[in-house]
């Protein structure tokens, strides 16, 4: 008789790294990682995703919407996730804004971070009768309203003295909390400045003016810049020689804010009432279809593997986990080379 011993074997192209034995050849593996390719951004599956703050506000930037430009008034949909599609928000129409003096560029991004956002139905203060008045409310030909008349931002009132065009010591107005559902109140305010001749004509004082806002433990001070600004046109409107500085303050439920001002103040009017949290991620529009995950570098991803390699960046949703190198799960046995046949005895 012949007695032969041996083991089954097969070629093994699979190598896995183990914690105890280093690289090991195995008979089978399951890949656990994928390398995504860049795609368009999408709506996040199972939740509401917000692109533009106001999808129905045509030809409006998010800053237009946040400031209440007359032709950019509309409903902001609730959303659990938001796309930050204007990394550095562009300017708003109506009036040239000195963006670099305040955090106003952050206002649209602040609003994006809330799930529910609504504009109050009435004004937070009576601007015409504010301290230092009576005032008439200034408008801009570059800011037409729905009736094609001159208008201004819904969140602010440009307080121009009616007849007491004289210099004034700092005046104080209290800004009450008027939101009704325990939301954060975002109150927008600012001030106007121009050349000396215009300041004297509008306000009776051509000197730099002082302004202070205070709310929720945060106090901010400003001094207006008086000078000959070059004419600037916003969104094809009329050339403007003046500039406005716009800021905002966040008031917590029941908390009163204060604004101390001199001439040229833009008093708060309608305020934003915001609640809940919305996850924000940098991306681009339009949103096409749905995806399991939104990734800053790759756009919309559908999760096919538990891990991914490639560019590491912020992601929201049901996302694979980033790893530096590909991972494999061994689903076979350790490879053994073919056994040599024993010689006949």
UniProtKB/Swiss-Prot annotation:
<keyword id="KW-0564">Palmitate</keyword>
<keyword id="KW-1170">Fusion of virus membrane with host endosomal membrane</keyword>
<comment type="subunit">
    <text>Homotrimer of disulfide-linked HA1-HA2.</text>
</comment>
<keyword id="KW-0348">Hemagglutinin</keyword>
<feature type="glycosylation site" description="N-linked (GlcNAc...) asparagine; by host">
    <location>
        <position position="231"/>
    </location>
</feature>
<comment type="similarity">
    <text>Belongs to the influenza viruses hemagglutinin family.</text>
</comment>
<keyword id="KW-0449">Lipoprotein</keyword>
<keyword id="KW-0325">Glycoprotein</keyword>
<dbReference type="InterPro" id="IPR001364">
    <property type="entry name" value="Hemagglutn_influenz_A/B"/>
</dbReference>
<dbReference type="InterPro" id="IPR008980">
    <property type="entry name" value="Capsid_hemagglutn"/>
</dbReference>
<keyword id="KW-0812">Transmembrane</keyword>
<keyword id="KW-1032">Host cell membrane</keyword>
<keyword id="KW-0946">Virion</keyword>
<dbReference type="GO" id="GO:0039654">
    <property type="term" value="P:fusion of virus membrane with host endosome membrane"/>
</dbReference>
<feature type="glycosylation site" description="N-linked (GlcNAc...) asparagine; by host">
    <location>
        <position position="59"/>
    </location>
</feature>
<keyword id="KW-0472">Membrane</keyword>
<dbReference type="GO" id="GO:0055036">
    <property type="term" value="C:virion membrane"/>
</dbReference>
<dbReference type="GO" id="GO:0019062">
    <property type="term" value="P:virion attachment to host cell"/>
</dbReference>
<dbReference type="Pfam" id="PF00509">
    <property type="entry name" value="Hemagglutinin"/>
</dbReference>
<dbReference type="GO" id="GO:0016020">
    <property type="term" value="C:membrane"/>
</dbReference>
<feature type="glycosylation site" description="N-linked (GlcNAc...) asparagine; by host">
    <location>
        <position position="331"/>
    </location>
</feature>
<keyword id="KW-0261">Viral envelope protein</keyword>
<keyword id="KW-1162">Viral penetration into host cytoplasm</keyword>
<keyword id="KW-1160">Virus entry into host cell</keyword>
<dbReference type="GO" id="GO:0019064">
    <property type="term" value="P:fusion of virus membrane with host plasma membrane"/>
</dbReference>
<dbReference type="GO" id="GO:0020002">
    <property type="term" value="C:host cell plasma membrane"/>
</dbReference>
<feature type="glycosylation site" description="N-linked (GlcNAc...) asparagine; by host">
    <location>
        <position position="145"/>
    </location>
</feature>
<comment type="function">
    <text>Binds to sialic acid-containing receptors on the cell surface, bringing about the attachment of the virus particle to the cell. Plays a major role in the determination of host range restriction and virulence. Class I viral fusion protein. Responsible for penetration of the virus into the cell cytoplasm by mediating the fusion of the membrane of the endocytosed virus particle with the endosomal membrane. Low pH in endosomes induce an irreversible conformational change in HA2, releasing the fusion hydrophobic peptide. Several trimers are required to form a competent fusion pore.</text>
</comment>
<keyword id="KW-0945">Host-virus interaction</keyword>
<dbReference type="GO" id="GO:0046789">
    <property type="term" value="F:host cell surface receptor binding"/>
</dbReference>
<feature type="glycosylation site" description="N-linked (GlcNAc...) asparagine; by host">
    <location>
        <position position="164"/>
    </location>
</feature>
<feature type="glycosylation site" description="N-linked (GlcNAc...) asparagine; by host">
    <location>
        <position position="25"/>
    </location>
</feature>
<feature type="glycosylation site" description="N-linked (GlcNAc...) asparagine; by host">
    <location>
        <position position="302"/>
    </location>
</feature>
<dbReference type="GO" id="GO:0046718">
    <property type="term" value="P:symbiont entry into host cell"/>
</dbReference>
<keyword id="KW-1161">Viral attachment to host cell</keyword>
<keyword id="KW-1168">Fusion of virus membrane with host membrane</keyword>
<protein>
    <recommendedName>
        <fullName>Hemagglutinin</fullName>
    </recommendedName>
</protein>
<dbReference type="InterPro" id="IPR013828">
    <property type="entry name" value="Hemagglutn_HA1_a/b_dom_sf"/>
</dbReference>
<keyword id="KW-1043">Host membrane</keyword>
<dbReference type="GO" id="GO:0019031">
    <property type="term" value="C:viral envelope"/>
</dbReference>
<keyword id="KW-1015">Disulfide bond</keyword>
């Amino acid at each position: 008789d012949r007695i032969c011993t041996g083991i089954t074997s097969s070629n093994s192209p699979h190598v896995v790294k183990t914690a105890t034995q280093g690289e090991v050849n195995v008979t089978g593996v399951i890949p656990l990682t994928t390398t995504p390719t860049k795609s368009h951004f999408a709506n996040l599956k199972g939740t509401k995703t917000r692109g533009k703050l106001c999808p129905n506000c045509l030809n409006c930037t998010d800053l237009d919407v946040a400031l209440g430009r007359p032709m950019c008034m509309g409903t902001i949909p609730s959303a659990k996730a938001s796309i930050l599609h204007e990394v550095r928000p562009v300017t708003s129409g109506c009036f040239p804004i000195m963006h670099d003096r305040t955090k106003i560029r952050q206002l649209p991004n602040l609003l994006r971070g809330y799930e529910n956002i609504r504009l109050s139905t009435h004004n937070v203060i009576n601007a015409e009768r504010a301290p230092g008045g009576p005032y008439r409310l200034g408008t801009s030909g570059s800011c037409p309203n729905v009736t094609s008349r001159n208008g201004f931002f819904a969140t602010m009132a440009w307080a121009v003295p009616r007849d007491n065009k004289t210099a004034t010591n700092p005046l104080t107005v209290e800004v009450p909390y008027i939101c009704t559902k325990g939301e954060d109140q975002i109150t927008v305010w600012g001030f106007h400045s121009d050349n000396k001749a215009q300041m004297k004509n509008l306000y009776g004082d051509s000197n730099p003016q002082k302004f202070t806002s205070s709310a929720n433990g945060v106090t901010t001070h400003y001094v207006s810049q008086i000078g000959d600004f070059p004419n600037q046109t916003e969104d094809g409107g009329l050339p403007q020689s003046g500039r406005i500085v716009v800021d905002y303050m966040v008031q917590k439920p029941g908390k009163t804010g204060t604004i101390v001002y001199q001439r040229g103040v833009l008093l708060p009017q309608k305020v934003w009432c915001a609640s809940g949290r919305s996850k924000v991620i940098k991306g681009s529009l339009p949103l096409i279809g749905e995806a399991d995950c939104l990734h800053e570098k790759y756009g919309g991803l559908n999760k096919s593997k538990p891990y991914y390699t490639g560019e590491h960046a912020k992601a929201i949703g049901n996302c694979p986990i980033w790893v530096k190198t590909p991972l494999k799960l061994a689903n076979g046995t350790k490879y053994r080379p073919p056994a040599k046949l024993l010689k006949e005895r």
